[in-house]
Amino acid sequence: MDPNTVSSFQVDCFLWHVRKQVPDQELGDAPFLDRLRRDQKSLRGRGSTLGLNIETATRVGKQIVERILKEESDEALKMTMASAPASRYLTDMTIEEMSRDWFMLMPKQKVAGPLCIRMDQAIMDKNIILKANFSVIFDRLETLILLRAFTEEGAIVGEISPLPSLPGHTNEDVKNAIGVLIGGLEWNDNTVRVSKTLQRFAWRSSNENGRPPLTPKQKRKMARTIRSKV
């Protein structure tokens, strides 16, 4: 096993432990709590994959961080913080929308790289909007926290979430997963659009209405409809 992989996991475990103290003292806001919960699931998945105990890893991670801080000068720390780019956390969904349980009558699940796509194939002829909570850096999506598909009535009918066992994903990974989810929902004649936030940062293949361009299947269907009317 790569020692760098192990030490990275150990440090992440300790840093999560430190961050956990913030909400314990009633200091964390909603985005902070979102990331904390997601990171906890990710650490559990990584620990299972690596075969490492999280409690033991946290102790070792503390030793690594303490050693680094002991060697780090205040001036070097200031320079590092000044040069580090700042990311922004954007939210389409409320805490309730993110944490709400949902059920599928005809479940379908697909893994696309480090992302898991779930949708209910029983949903037909609905207007659906995709919403997501994610961080942005350099005007591009950095980390997807969670994406969900909602009907006009507010029911959840689809979801894209990071796989805890495969941390890390790119903007292209997210864009590809969105394409898969949209394609699956549109197969049952649903009309899908993305939120303005997603359209700006993660799904640039949309038209001015926030909808993706028509697929070949949709174009053929539209052509048949037009011919029948003529």
Swiss-Prot record:
The keyword Ubl conjugation applies. The dsRNA-binding region is required for suppression of RNA silencing. This is Non-structural protein 1. It comes from the Viruses. GO terms for molecular function: protein serine/threonine kinase inhibitor activity; RNA binding. A motif (Nuclear export signal) lies at residues 137-146. SUPFAM superfamilies: Ns1 effector domain-like, S15/NS1 RNA-binding domain. Residues 217-230 have a biased composition (Basic residues). It comes from Influenza A virus (strain A/Leningrad/134/1957 H2N2). The lineage of its organism: Viruses, Riboviria, Orthornavirae, Negarnaviricota, Polyploviricotina. Belongs to the influenza A viruses NS1 family. Homodimer. Interacts with host TRIM25 (via coiled coil); this interaction specifically inhibits TRIM25 multimerization and TRIM25-mediated RIGI CARD ubiquitination. Interacts with human EIF2AK2/PKR, CPSF4, IVNS1ABP and PABPN1.
